[in-house]
Structures are given as structure tokens and as C-alpha cells.
């Protein structure tokens, strides 16, 4: 990838991968916590929610910057004992202050609306006094967009640049037009 000129790589790291030591020795620039659910509990995965939560949180010991969904109750746990710089995102203004994040490190989505225009669904929200549009409907896509915006900002990209990308983003096989 480096020989091909790639400067950034985005990858998913599973809690099972962490448990099985598949990322030992890898240092990440940024790690993102999007959500916590019960879908990884069972044979071959995690024995309990506590185990799942523990392994999911270990990723934040191997990164310089941690970005978290402040609307998820497990976000505080993810950043306990961790030495990375914390950034957050939320759809509720008060969450950043309640979870111990400095306001300058929290990106808040406001005035979220789901629209139908020309037979197509889209999502509009405001953050940092900017309007963002997504061709993808659903609040979970707002959370994913906030995570992407925070990540790109931490990498030095301008929010305007990131907003242009989000406006035209299509995920093949998911909610395609």
C-alpha cells in the first residue's frame, strides 16, 4: 500500500481479533468507538458482556487518538485507564461535558432531519455551524458521519472537504438507490 502511494488505511478491528492477539504490536494513529451491543456474545465469540467490553476497550491502549460515541453508555469505560487523547461525537449537546470531554474535542450534530427529495431519502444535520448532507438515511448514519468527520479532522483534513465526501458517499450493497 505504501509503495502504491497510500497515505491512510482504514480497517475494522474486531474484539475477537484483539482477544486472539491478532493486533499485538500494532500502534494505531486513531481508534474509533461507534457503539456497544450484545451481538458478539456466545460460543466462539465472548462469554459475557463484561468480557466483550473489556476486549473492545483494549484497542484504546494501542492508539494515539481515541474517538468515541458519547451517546453510548459504554464510551466512558472504553477510555478508562487509557492514555490516548480523547475526542468525541454526540447528537446531544450535554453528553460531552457529562462524560469528561473538553468541548473543543466534541463534535455535536444538531437539527437532524430526514428528508425525501425527488424520491430519494437523505439526511441533513449541522455540526460546528456547518450543514452536512448524507445520501444515506438513518440516525446511525449520522453517528458514522460524525465519527468520520472527527477522524478526518484529527488527520488534518478540513471539515468542508470531509463534508463534500459525505454528501456523495454511497455504501455498495447498503441502502443503494
Segments (PLM) and residue ranges:
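Short, well-ordered alpha-helical microsegments
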Residues: 17-20, 74-76
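ATP-dependent NMP and nucleoside kinases share a basic, alpha-helical "lid"
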Residues: 18-30
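Switch II (G3) loop of P-loop NTPases
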Residues: 6-18
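A generic local secondary-structure boundary/capping motif
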Residues: 1, 20-23, 56-57
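Acidic, Mg2+-coordinating active-site environments of NTP-dependent enzymes
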Residues: 3-4, 32-177
Amino acid at each position: 500500500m505504501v509503495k502504491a502511494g497510500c497515505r491512510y488505511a482504514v480497517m475494522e478491528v474486531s474484539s475477537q481479533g484483539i482477544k486472539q492477539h491478532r493486533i499485538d504490536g500494532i500502534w494505531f494513529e486513531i481508534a474509533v468507538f461507534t457503539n456497544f451491543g450484545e451481538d458478539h456474545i456466545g460460543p466462539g465469540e465472548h462469554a459475557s458482556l463484561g468480557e466483550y467490553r473489556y476486549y473492545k476497550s483494549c484497542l484504546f491502549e494501542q492508539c494515539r487518538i481515541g474517538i468515541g460515541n458519547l451517546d453510548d453508555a459504554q464510551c466512558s469505560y472504553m477510555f478508562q485507564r487509557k492514555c490516548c487523547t480523547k475526542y468525541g461525537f454526540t447528537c446531544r449537546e450535554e453528553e460531552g461535558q457529562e462524560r469528561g470531554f473538553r468541548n473543543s474535542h466534541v463534535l455535536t450534530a444538531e437539527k437532524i432531519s430526514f428528508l425525501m427529495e425527488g424520491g430519494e431519502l437523505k439526511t441533513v444535520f449541522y455540526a460546528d455551524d456547518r450543514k452536512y448532507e448524507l445520501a444515506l438515511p438513518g440516525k446511525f448514519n449520522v453517528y458514522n458521519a460524525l465519527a468520520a468527520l472527527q477522524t478526518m479532522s484529527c488527520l488534518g483534513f478540513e471539515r468542508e472537504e470531509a463534508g463534500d465526501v459525505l454528501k456523495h458517499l454511497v455504501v455498495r450493497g447498503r441502502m443503494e438507490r
